[in-house]
Protein backbone atom coordinates (compact mmCIF):
# COMPACT_ATOMS: atom_id res chain seq x y z
CA UNK A 1 0.00 0.00 0.00
CA UNK A 2 0.98 3.63 -0.39
CA UNK A 3 1.39 4.19 3.35
CA UNK A 4 3.68 1.18 3.72
CA UNK A 5 5.88 2.11 0.75
CA UNK A 6 6.09 5.89 1.05
CA UNK A 7 8.85 5.85 3.67
CA UNK A 8 10.56 2.59 2.67
CA UNK A 9 10.87 2.44 -1.10
CA UNK A 10 9.39 5.66 -2.51
CA UNK A 11 10.92 8.32 -0.22
CA UNK A 12 13.15 6.44 2.26
CA UNK A 13 14.84 9.48 3.85
CA UNK A 14 11.65 11.44 4.47
CA UNK A 15 10.06 12.11 7.82
CA UNK A 16 6.85 13.59 6.37
CA UNK A 17 4.62 12.32 3.58
CA UNK A 18 5.65 14.09 0.36
CA UNK A 19 3.10 16.45 -1.15
CA UNK A 20 0.68 14.04 -2.81
CA UNK A 21 -2.22 14.66 -5.18
CA UNK A 22 -4.93 12.01 -5.47
CA UNK A 23 -7.30 12.05 -8.45
CA UNK A 24 -10.83 10.86 -7.56
CA UNK A 25 -13.80 10.05 -9.83
CA UNK A 26 -16.44 12.17 -8.12
CA UNK A 27 -16.88 14.53 -5.19
CA UNK A 28 -18.36 11.70 -3.13
CA UNK A 29 -15.44 9.43 -4.05
CA UNK A 30 -13.06 12.22 -2.95
CA UNK A 31 -14.81 12.40 0.44
CA UNK A 32 -14.42 8.63 0.88
CA UNK A 33 -10.73 8.77 -0.04
CA UNK A 34 -10.09 11.62 2.41
CA UNK A 35 -11.63 9.67 5.28
CA UNK A 36 -9.63 6.54 4.44
CA UNK A 37 -6.36 8.50 4.13
CA UNK A 38 -6.90 10.24 7.47
CA UNK A 39 -7.74 6.93 9.15
CA UNK A 40 -4.82 5.02 7.58
CA UNK A 41 -2.25 7.67 8.49
CA UNK A 42 -3.85 8.42 11.87
CA UNK A 43 -3.95 12.11 11.02
CA UNK A 44 -6.49 14.91 11.39
CA UNK A 45 -8.32 17.20 9.01
CA UNK A 46 -5.32 19.37 8.12
CA UNK A 47 -3.33 16.39 6.80
CA UNK A 48 -5.61 15.54 3.87
CA UNK A 49 -8.03 17.95 2.22
CA UNK A 50 -10.36 18.06 -0.74
CA UNK A 51 -9.68 20.65 -3.41
CA UNK A 52 -12.68 20.70 -5.72
CA UNK A 53 -14.98 23.40 -7.04
CA UNK A 54 -17.60 22.38 -4.46
CA UNK A 55 -15.22 22.30 -1.48
CA UNK A 56 -15.09 25.05 1.12
CA UNK A 57 -12.49 27.73 0.22
CA UNK A 58 -10.79 25.71 -2.54
CA UNK A 59 -8.47 28.58 -3.54
CA UNK A 60 -7.21 29.00 0.05
CA UNK A 61 -6.71 25.26 0.42
CA UNK A 62 -4.88 25.13 -2.92
CA UNK A 63 -2.63 27.99 -1.81
CA UNK A 64 -1.88 26.16 1.46
CA UNK A 65 -1.15 22.94 -0.45
CA UNK A 66 1.26 24.87 -2.66
CA UNK A 67 3.03 26.92 0.06
CA UNK A 68 2.49 25.45 3.54
CA UNK A 69 3.36 22.25 5.39
CA UNK A 70 -0.31 21.18 5.54
CA UNK A 71 -2.14 19.67 3.79
CA UNK A 72 0.29 16.88 2.90
CA UNK A 73 -2.27 15.15 0.67
CA UNK A 74 -4.88 16.80 -1.54
CA UNK A 75 -7.74 14.97 -3.23
CA UNK A 76 -9.27 16.47 -6.36
CA UNK A 77 -11.69 15.55 -9.11
CA UNK A 78 -10.94 18.08 -11.84
CA UNK A 79 -9.90 21.35 -10.21
CA UNK A 80 -6.15 20.65 -10.08
CA UNK A 81 -6.09 18.27 -13.04
CA UNK A 82 -5.04 20.92 -15.55
CA UNK A 83 -3.42 24.32 -15.61
CA UNK A 84 -2.62 24.57 -11.91
CA UNK A 85 0.99 24.82 -10.81
CA UNK A 86 1.88 23.18 -7.48
CA UNK A 87 5.62 22.64 -7.75
CA UNK A 88 6.12 20.64 -4.50
CA UNK A 89 3.90 17.73 -5.67
CA UNK A 90 6.10 14.63 -5.63
CA UNK A 91 3.48 11.92 -5.86
CA UNK A 92 0.37 11.48 -8.02
CA UNK A 93 -2.13 8.78 -7.07
CA UNK A 94 -4.70 7.82 -9.70
CA UNK A 95 -7.91 6.48 -8.17
CA UNK A 96 -9.82 7.01 -11.43
CA UNK A 97 -9.37 6.06 -15.05
CA UNK A 98 -9.00 8.66 -17.78
CA UNK A 99 -9.98 8.05 -21.40
CA UNK A 100 -8.50 11.16 -23.02
CA UNK A 101 -4.79 11.01 -23.85
CA UNK A 102 -4.46 14.81 -23.65
CA UNK A 103 -6.25 15.01 -20.28
CA UNK A 104 -4.10 12.21 -18.85
CA UNK A 105 -0.93 14.01 -19.99
CA UNK A 106 -2.16 17.22 -18.34
CA UNK A 107 -2.91 15.34 -15.11
CA UNK A 108 0.58 13.82 -15.10
CA UNK A 109 1.93 17.32 -15.72
CA UNK A 110 0.96 18.26 -12.13
CA UNK A 111 4.03 16.36 -10.94
CA UNK A 112 6.57 17.47 -13.53
CA UNK A 113 7.59 20.80 -12.04
CA UNK A 114 11.15 20.94 -10.71
CA UNK A 115 12.03 22.68 -7.47
CA UNK A 116 15.25 23.55 -5.65
CA UNK A 117 16.05 21.77 -2.39
CA UNK A 118 15.68 25.03 -0.44
CA UNK A 119 12.24 25.75 -1.89
CA UNK A 120 11.10 22.14 -1.42
CA UNK A 121 12.23 22.21 2.22
CA UNK A 122 9.85 25.12 2.87
CA UNK A 123 6.95 22.64 2.63
CA UNK A 124 8.81 19.33 3.12
CA UNK A 125 11.56 20.01 5.70
CA UNK A 126 13.19 16.57 5.49
CA UNK A 127 13.73 16.75 1.70
CA UNK A 128 17.46 16.30 1.10
CA UNK A 129 17.73 17.10 -2.61
CA UNK A 130 16.17 19.06 -5.45
CA UNK A 131 12.83 17.87 -6.77
CA UNK A 132 13.69 16.55 -10.21
CA UNK A 133 11.27 13.63 -10.49
CA UNK A 134 7.89 12.44 -9.25
CA UNK A 135 6.13 9.15 -8.59
CA UNK A 136 2.88 7.89 -10.11
CA UNK A 137 0.85 5.40 -8.09
CA UNK A 138 -1.59 3.72 -10.46
CA UNK A 139 -4.33 2.14 -8.34
CA UNK A 140 -6.79 1.60 -11.21
CA UNK A 141 -4.77 0.76 -14.34
CA UNK A 142 -4.89 4.27 -15.81
CA UNK A 143 -1.38 3.93 -17.27
CA UNK A 144 -2.45 0.81 -19.20
CA UNK A 145 -5.98 1.73 -20.28
CA UNK A 146 -6.67 2.76 -23.86
CA UNK A 147 -6.69 6.51 -24.41
CA UNK A 148 -8.41 8.35 -27.23
CA UNK A 149 -7.01 11.26 -29.18
CA UNK A 150 -9.05 14.40 -28.83
CA UNK A 151 -9.13 17.21 -31.30
CA UNK A 152 -10.30 20.74 -31.06
CA UNK A 153 -13.30 21.94 -32.96
CA UNK A 154 -12.40 24.01 -35.96
CA UNK A 155 -15.51 26.08 -36.33
CA UNK A 156 -15.48 28.50 -39.25
CA UNK A 157 -16.46 31.89 -37.83
CA UNK A 158 -17.98 32.97 -41.14
CA UNK A 159 -20.52 30.11 -41.14
CA UNK A 160 -23.59 30.66 -38.98
CA UNK A 161 -25.12 27.93 -36.83
CA UNK A 162 -28.24 28.09 -38.98
CA UNK A 163 -26.17 27.49 -42.12
CA UNK A 164 -24.29 24.59 -40.48
CA UNK A 165 -27.58 22.97 -39.43
CA UNK A 166 -29.00 23.40 -42.91
CA UNK A 167 -25.90 21.81 -44.48
CA UNK A 168 -26.17 18.80 -42.14
CA UNK A 169 -29.92 18.50 -42.83
CA UNK A 170 -29.16 18.47 -46.56
CA UNK A 171 -26.72 15.59 -46.08
CA UNK A 172 -23.37 17.38 -45.93
CA UNK A 173 -21.15 14.97 -43.97
CA UNK A 174 -17.81 16.55 -44.79
CA UNK A 175 -15.23 16.75 -42.01
CA UNK A 176 -15.23 20.56 -42.19
CA UNK A 177 -18.98 20.68 -41.57
CA UNK A 178 -19.05 18.03 -38.85
CA UNK A 179 -16.21 19.58 -36.85
CA UNK A 180 -17.46 23.15 -37.10
Where are these regions (language model features)?
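Conserved RecA-like P-loop NTPase helicase motor core
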Residues: 45-152
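Long, largely alpha-helical accessory region at the distal end of helicase-like NTP-driven motors
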Residues: 140-180
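Glycine-rich, flexible loop segments associated with nucleotide phosphate handling
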Residues: 14-22, 125-135, 158
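Conserved C-terminal RecA-like helicase domain
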Residues: 1-74
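Alpha-helix initiation and N-capping motif
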Residues: 30, 58-59, 101, 133, ...
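Short, charged low-complexity intrinsically disordered segments located at boundaries
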Residues: 26-35, 135-145, 167-169
Amino acid sequence: TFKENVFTSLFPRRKEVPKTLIFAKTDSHADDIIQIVRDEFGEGNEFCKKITYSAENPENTLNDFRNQYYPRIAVTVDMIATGTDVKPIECLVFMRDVRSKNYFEQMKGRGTRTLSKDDLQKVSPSASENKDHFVIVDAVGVTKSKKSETRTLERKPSVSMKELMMNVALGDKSEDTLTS
